[in-house]
Structures are given as structure tokens and as C-alpha cells.
């Protein structure tokens, strides 16, 4: 079985929008930003796939093309929709706006944070045992700078034992 889809749809945003569920929209956005935060902090060269910067949903148009209909990977290979960028340009600084604008601004903040933290400049990354199945922990160290990251993959607050982190 192959799992295909855009990050936003796989994170639950598409379903939350269809169901007009504000709480689930918020959780989906938080899941997306968690994944982007990890991508930008864990090491290596981060990659944003087409449309992730504003939360593009699955594109089902591929099912209309017989040459593509049998390949579910086309669901996350949308045509570029330039009107999304125009909407971002019009409203990005206003503080209000769409889900796409919020995601875009948040990713921009994460990128700026990555640039400002010297510990993220190097390539060294060590996992931290959190003793909690919901929490991923890792440490980044570079030229005397140190950063520890904890990522909670649950929708609920989690506890880790600080004594085990020494």
C-alpha cells in the first residue's frame, strides 16, 4: 500500500476544512508546523515540497487523466496555482487572513529562527531518549552552541523526566 498526499491533507487539514471543524483545523496546522520545525532543525538541507509553504491540499484532478489516474502519487503533484501567491502578497502583513497565510508566515518565522541559532549550522545531531513514545528529542551542537529539541507528536501535553536528560 502506498500513502500519498500533501502534508496539509495528511495532517488532517483537508478533512477539517470539509467538516468546518475549527479545532481540527488548528490541530492540523500545528501538526504541519511541528513537521516543518523538525525539518528545519534536525540537520541537513531542509526541503519544502511544492505548495507546503501555504498548506496546499490534495489535488484530485489527476483522476481525470487516464494516463495518471492509476498512480496515486499525482495527488500531491498539483499544478502551480499562482492565485495562492497573489493572496499571500495581498494579506501577509495584515495579521489576519487565511490558513495559507498563517502557514506561510509561520514557516518564514521558523526559517528565520533556524538562521539565528548557531547550533543549527553544523551537521551533528544526537537523539535524546525521552522515555515517552509521543515525544521525539534530539540535540544539536556546533562550535560550543547547544540546542535541545523536543517534539510532541500527541495532541495532548506530555511529560518527560528531566533527570533522564542529564
Regions found by a protein language model. Name each.
Residues 1-166:
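Active-site and adjacent substrate-binding regions of carbohydrate-active enzymes
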